[in-house]
């Protein structure tokens, strides 16, 4: 049977109390050192790296990438997932190329694959991602880079 819980005003945090706690730096955060970018691929925007150690002891990174011609907002219309590998998390990484791209047609992920997350499940790997489908739009995917930002906005909104 569910337990009923009641809270009094004294049990709740005030917004001032929450804000002051949020301003404090945690011990974990104090130990972080920025390294800069660890993965750059010429001609592409790179986003959302999902690293995992493989059975070979190397770091495998699955990441989103899309051509610079699609501008930064092109993630929703022309993104693919690629794979890179390194001996340590800090790199350097060797790009192994695309592992998954939009399937075309009217599939839910016909145009773009984005935000990969790789997980080890027993002796297999599962790659989770989001996708976008532009098959019902009144434009070809290859025509998007030539649009002005203002003209592109309506397609971006439809895909998001």
Regions found by a protein language model. Give the residues of each.
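Beta-rich carbohydrate-recognition and catalytic domains
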Residues: 1-48, 52-111, 119-160
